[in-house]
Regions:
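Aromatic-lined carbohydrate-recognition surfaces of secreted/lumenal glycan-active proteins
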Residues: 432-457, 503-517, 550-561
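Extracytoplasmic
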Residues: 29-191, 210, 290, 745-751
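N-terminal secretory signal peptides and thylakoid transit peptides that target proteins
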Residues: 1-16
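Active-site cleft segment of glycoside hydrolase catalytic domains centered on the general acid/base Glu
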Residues: 377-471, 475-494, 521-539, 569-571
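C-terminal beta-strand-rich structural cap/linker in extracellular carbohydrate-active enzymes
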Residues: 649-687
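Aromatic/acidic polysaccharide-binding cleft in carbohydrate-active enzymes
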Residues: 516, 522-584, 600-602
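N-terminal substrate-binding region of glycoside hydrolase catalytic domains
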Residues: 290-394, 408, 414
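Carbohydrate-binding surface patches
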Residues: 95, 601-636, 641-642, 664
Length: 805
């Protein structure tokens, strides 16, 4: 069984691993400095942002922007004058709203842009971990680290600007709350960043391309600033070192050429020439193989991005390019339904549509996930689903019309903290799937990403949802306590066996979340040891998932992501590639179309191997072992976990915890990649959806993040009134005959005729009284099934669980 991400983090299973973690290097600060300069948000010399009074604000007021109106050409802005007692570098902090959710508030704001002394505006494009780790201030405001500025002595002008909207609970808007900001003098200048690759990249480049290291100071030096640097590869071997000097003048950067390096992931440590190693700034870069990953439908690899929340607007294009260069063919993303449809039928999707267009422009196929419904669409009894499933149909049709490659009908409905039931969710899935299917050239329909096999999924499948889908989906994570070498969870095998039992083994299975939990402290990236474990696990999980029959794997997650003491991203908090990024690039390029052939036989004890066809006339064996062993590989070309080719041919290879790729040419034609699975066209009877509704007082128990134990059914009295909604998602009126099929000891009496005419795109409601006889055992789940026919054809049933409370 695979653990799910929400339950594992809720359980706090990661605390035992924290003591072993190291810290990233910190930068020294001067001990003597002038007093901090604090400016109230409402003290702007020019602004078009409203000022709001609030006694909690430090000056009794603050700037408060919350507008759906597009800004004027100068943006929503506030300009301030600041008197600096001396020239130099100043750290900038602000009490304001963060652009992402934090542990202490769900309030978010637009990404800020800054301009100093009428210079160009620059977005504060920090990653989610920086914002997430901010300390609380008051209300929805946090104490934000906005980086460093170089001020001149005397008067300076500082302008904050908003030009991009953000997603709020009630819709998309331009938002900012600014109470005050503070500038603190830094002593001297220091090295602030080291990166590689060309401009507009996330420190990546292709093997064979010329590349430089770029070193950046946080200000202009008064004297020549001499720095030293060292570059080590994934295996800890030093591959480059040297010195560079930034001369006084207009420049704050210097470049140093890199030698011709093999594909891999590299760690750079740089510091002032006379500083200690503990003061070094650390950067990462990736040299990618010249062999590109497979594109189009043949690509089996995806990554979770959630770009609106995790990727600053100015980084979006470079991020998308980095994911494609890593070999991902798909991205999994989604927008908040409440923001996309703030009122019935009024859609506001342009913000998210721009993200999707950017991803597609870089060759990535979007998998769009439907979020919980807006508040206006829900009732206390329907939460988190719309009470009227026609809203689900129309919203899904709208999403499909924006041309994602696939639409996933929800995310982990089995492990939320509501009382929603699997039968209600199945009715929602049918309605949403019909909305997708009824669009021209529809995208693939993907079943909800189930967190864990169990009662919820079993009941949802009993409601015959598979016939509405092109793809079966699930998630799986290893035990969070396994920090050293996590084992791939059994979720893939469980789901394969479940699909086979249902006769649905021909439906492609996608693992739309797979990843691992790595415990971190605030302000700290993964340690080098953790980075290696993450890289190894990514390869093993992708390989074992494909070997278990998965058609596609989505890693969680691509962007930098820190959540409740756990780090998930393939990029560092500086948006630079970690070793797992390079491991993914090697995997996707070498496996190609990744046609699974079978396990590798004849290996020594402790060694594991799986064979794939690349689609290029090659056999690719992926091998690893708990302890180093020698394995014969006559006539093969060997690549390491980073994609580096072995220097010379050898009859044997040492296999260890780091996977290796053994590639040999094969005779015959490459295996053809199958066309995407498409379900048959849905019949008029399948366009009829039955949905059981019960009063809130009869709600099922709360799912408690999936930890609730049976009985899980609606809690009924001896006599309970309930309703059955009959939806007709066709374009003509339909006459439907309904029948109730209660379990033994129960009866269901219709209060209305059970033959009903349902208008096109309409709903009719039938009332029933459900009665339990004296022999019914309390607190035990029983099935209650409603069936129907349309012109003699069976309508997919609605099957619930009920219990006598």
């Amino acid at each position: 069984m695979g653990l799910n991400r929400r339950t594992a983090m809720k359980a706090g299973l990661l605390t035992t691993a924290m003591s072993a973690l190291g810290l990233n290097s910190a930068h020294p600060q001067g001990t003597s400095a002038p007093p901090p300069i604090t400016v109230q948000g409402e003290a702007a010399v020019r602004t078009n942002i409203p000022v709001v009074r609030d006694r909690r604000a430090s000056g009794g007021s603050y700037l408060a922007l919350n507008s759906k109106k597009k800004p004027p050409k100068e943006g929503w802005y506030a300009t301030y004058t600041v008197q600096a007692p001396e020239a130099g570098v100043y750290a900038l902090t602000a009490v304001a709203t963060a652009p992402v959710e934090t542990p202490h508030t769900e309030a978010t704001a637009s990404y800020l842009q800054l301009a100093l002394n009428n210079g160009q505006f620059v977005e504060i494009a920090r990653s989610q971990p920086y914002w997430y780790e901010s300390k609380p201030a008051w209300g929805g405001l946090s104490v934000l680290d906005l980086g460093e500025l170089e001020l001149r002595r005397g008067e300076n002008t500082l302008t904050f600007r908003v030009t991009e909207p953000t997603v709020l609970e009630t819709g998309t808007a331009y938002a900012l709350a600014l109470d005050r900001f503070t500038l603190r003098r830094r002593e001297g200048v220091r090295l602030s960043e080291v990166r590689a690759g060309g401009d507009g990249t996330l420190s990546t480049y292709r093997h064979g391309e010329p590349a430089n290291l770029t070193f950046t100071l946080n200000g202009h030096p008064d004297h020549p600033y001499r720095l030293r640097y060292a570059v080590v590869d994934y295996f800890g071997e030093r591959v480059a070192e040297g010195y560079a000097t930034i001369e006084p003048g207009d420049e704050t950067t210097v470049k140093a050429p890199l030698p011709q390096l093999p594909p891999g992931n590299y760690r750079v440590a740089a510091s002032a020439a006379d500083a200690s190693d503990t003061e070094a700034v650390v950067g990462h870069f990736a040299c990618l193989s010249a062999l590109l990953a497979t594109s189009g439908d043949a690509n089996r690899f995806g990554v979770n991005v959630w770009a609106t929340s995790l990727v600053p607007p100015s980084r979006l294009s470079a991020f998308a390019a980095a994911m494609r260069d890593m070999g991902a063919g798909w991205i999994r993303d989604g927008q908040a339904w409440p923001a996309a449809e703030p009122s019935p039928g009024a859609y506001d999707t342009e913000h998210h549509d721009r993200v999707t267009r950017t991803m597609r422009r870089h060759g990535l196929s979007p998998l769009e996930v439907i979020s919980p419904a807006p508040e206006w669409a829900m009732t206390a009894a329907s939460l988190p689903l719309p009470a009227d499933l026609r809203h689900a149909y129309r919203y899904a049709r709208r999403l499909a019309s924006r041309h994602p490659a696939a639409v996933q009908l929800s995310n982990e409905p089995d492990v939320d903290v509501t009382s929603s039931t699997a039968d209600a969710h199945a009715a929602f899935v049918k309605a949403a799937a019909l909305g997708v299917a009824d669009t021209p050239d529809p995208p693939l329909v993907v079943l909800p990403g189930i967190a864990q096999a169990g009662h919820f999924q079993d009941l949802m499948l009993a409601n015959d949802v598979v016939r509405y889908a092109d793809v079966w989906a699930f998630h799986g994570y290893p035990d969070p306590a396994e920090q050293d070498e996590p084992a791939f969870p059994g979720a893939a095998d469980e789901q394969r066996e479940l699909a086979e039992r249902l006769g649905a083994d021909d439906v492609p299975r996608w693992m739309t979340e797979c990843g691992a939990f790595f415990a971190v402290r605030p302000g700290v990236d993964l340690t080098p040891a953790q980075q290696a474990v993450q890289a190894r696990y990514l390869v093993r999980s992708m390989v074992e998932g494909l070997a278990a029959g998965n058609a596609r794997q989505f890693w969680f997650a691509g962007p930098p992501l820190h959540d409740d003491g756990v780090y998930f991203g393939l990029l560092s908090r500086e948006f630079q590639p970690l070793p797992a990024y390079s491991a993914c690039a090697a995997l996707t390029s070498l496996l190609g179309e990744a046609h699974f052939v079978g396990p590798v036989s004849g290996l020594p004890a402790g060694a594991v191997g799986f064979e794939f066809g690349s689609g290029r006339g090659e056999s690719v064996r992926v091998l690893w072992a708990a302890k180093p062993v020698r394995i014969p590989v006559p006539g093969a070309t060997v690549y390491d976990v980073m994609g580096r080719r072995a220097a010379s041919a050898s009859a044997e290879v040492t296999v260890s915890r780091d996977p290796v790729y053994v590639v040999t040419a094969t005779a015959g034609h490459p295996e053809a990649h199958p066309a995407p699975h498409r379900r048959p066209s849905l019949s008029p009877a399948e366009h009829i959806v039955l949905s059981q509704r019960y009063p809130a007082r009869n709600a099922a128990p709360n799912k408690d993040n999936g930890d609730a134990e049976p009985p899980l059914g609606y809690r009924l009295s001896r006599r309970t009134r309930m309703s059955l909604d009959v939806y007709n998602f066709t374009s003509t009126s339909r006459t439907v005959t309904v029948r109730a099929r209660p379990a033994e000891g129960w009866s269901a009496r219709a209060e209305d005729p059970t033959r009903v005419e349902v208008p096109p795109q309409g709903r009719m409601t039938l009332d029933f009284t459900i009665t339990a006889t004296s022999g019914v055992k309390r607190r035990t789940d029983h099935r209650l099934e409603f069936t129907a026919t349309l012109d003699g054809e069976k309508v997919p049933a609605s099957v619930s669980l009920v219990q006598l409370k």
